[in-house]
From Swiss-Prot:
EC main group: transferase
Family according to the record: Belongs to the LpxB family.
Keyword Lipid metabolism: yes
Alphabetically ordered keywords of this record: Glycosyltransferase, Lipid A biosynthesis, Lipid biosynthesis, Lipid metabolism, Transferase
A GO biological-process term: lipid A biosynthetic process
Role description: Condensation of UDP-2,3-diacylglucosamine and 2,3-diacylglucosamine-1-phosphate to form lipid A disaccharide, a precursor of lipid A, a phosphorylated glycolipid that anchors the lipopolysaccharide to the outer membrane of the cell.
Family annotation (Pfam families): LpxB
Name under which the protein is recorded: Lipid-A-disaccharide synthase
Signal peptide range: none
GO molecular function ontology, one term from the record: lipid-A-disaccharide synthase activity
Annotated metabolic or biological route of this protein: Bacterial outer membrane biogenesis; LPS lipid A biosynthesis
Lineage: Bacteria, Pseudomonadati, Pseudomonadota, Betaproteobacteria, Burkholderiales
Gene: lpxB
Top-rank lineage group of the source organism: Bacteria
Keyword Lipid metabolism: yes
């Protein structure tokens, strides 16, 4: 059934940079499939705005991490969410699309759904990794879920939640065979010799917690592997400034800090030491051996430990369904342990070949033309709504 030619209005919310990237790809797909007059508004970042999105609030107002760290931002977040709900109910867009940020978006999605506005959520929360009733909240809030990973629709189906597997956009963007030599040329690194990429995170709290440990591990690795070089991307000038005291404290390190270009830095590497997060999936798609680590404040760690039931936190291990790369978390993330594990990943050629096979299979599974599939799913929801009207 064709969509109406009168003006469509879609409200969207992305709460952090990764969501901005996903939403921008979705917007690109929607703009190819919906009338040119369609309007897109809500809360988004610069990538969404570049796609013609009208952001009514600054996205960074919603960007938080951790249970304890978020407390100071709660009043402002609740105020924005209340204003957004009132706007949705007054303007009644054709659909509301929440992109990730489930703690913020589920409440908005439930309000939209209760008012007869179709609610779509892009990025299924990790219902497969956490205990509790989150899937019940999804069932109350979401009309249709756009899933990045192939095992998620079966879980949602049991809860009565309609969903579409759309793949992961990183798998579309990253080539199956990374150009390590070209990446080294781009960064001015030697063509030969071992290179380790180190990614301690992008937030002040992350650098404060794990940065000193990562730098101490790098110092140990250089002692044990004298020819090794390190490359560390700094996403912003503020992050580079935050890293500078650690760099100054370790002048002996053969370290190159890049302005952004994290994917190029990882492509140039033979092994990666990385803080847990989406970047671990990127490392897997680049077919790189890695060690995954994180440290969070004690109370946050206790809450996470009690809620989680999977034995792993890194996306490569979750997708493989087993430990294919080591994880060293919290008090296990000592400089000695990180150095030992990373050098093992660097030196073990048989393991490298095995990981290349595992990660290539993972890459092919996730490569689905996400922007097109996600946009087509949204259009189907809009068509179904028109059919019921």
């Amino acid at each position: 059934m064709p969509l109406p030619t009168n003006q469509l209005r879609l409200a969207m919310v992305a709460g952090e940079p990764s969501g901005d990237l996903l939403a921008a790809s979705l917007l690109g797909g929607l703009r190819e499939r919906l009338p040119e007059s369609a309007q897109y508004y809500g809360i988004g970042g610069q990538r969404m705005i570049a796609q013609g999105f009208d952001s009514h609030w600054q996205m960074d107002k919603l960007t938080v991490r951790g249970y304890v760290e978020a407390l100071g931002q709660i009043p402002e977040i609740l105020r924005i969410r209340g204003e957004l709900k009132r706007q949705l109910l007054a303007e009644r867009p054709d659909a509301f699309i929440g992109v990730d940020a489930p703690d913020f978006n589920f409440s908005v999605e439930q309000a939209a759904r209760d008012a007869g506005i179709p609610s779509i959520h892009f990025v299924c929360p990790s219902i497969w990794a956490w205990r509790g009733g989150r899937i019940k909240k999804i069932a109350k809030s979401v009309d249709h879920m756009l899933c990045l990973f192939p095992f998620e629709p079966a879980i949602l189906d049991k809860a009565g939640v309609a969903s579409t597997y759309v793949g992961h956009p990183l798998a579309d963007d990253i080539p199956l065979e990374p150009d390590t030599h070209g990446a080294r040329i781009a960064l001015g690194l030697p063509a030969d010799g071992p290179v380790i990429a180190v990614l301690p995170g992008s937030r002040r709290s992350e650098i404060a917690l794990i940065g000193p440990t990562f730098f101490a591990a790098m110092a140990l690795m250089q002692q044990r592997e004298p020819g090794v070089r390190f490359v560390m991307p700094a996403a912003t000038p503020a992050l580079r400034e935050l890293l500078q005291p650690l760099v100054d404290a370790h002048p002996q390190l053969a370290l190159t800090i890049t302005d952004g270009r994290s994917q190029v830095a990882m492509t140039a590497a033979d092994a990666i030491l990385v803080k847990s997060g989406t970047v671990t999936l990127e490392a897997a798609l680049l077919k790189k051996p890695m060690v995954i680590s994180y440290k969070v404040p004690w109370l946050t760690g206790q809450i996470m430990r009690r809620q989680g039931y999977l034995p792993y936190v890194g996306l490569p291990n979750i997708l493989a369904g087993r430990f294919v790369v080591p994880e060293l978390l919290q008090h296990f993330a000592t400089p000695e342990a990180l150095a030992d594990a990373t050098l093992t990943q660097l030196r073990d050629d048989a393991n490298r070949r095995t990981l290349t096979e595992v990660f290539t299979e993972m890459h092919l599974s996730l490569r689905q033309n996400t922007a097109a599939k996600a946009a087509e799913a949204v259009v189907r929801v809009l068509e179904q709504r028109k059919g019921r009207a």
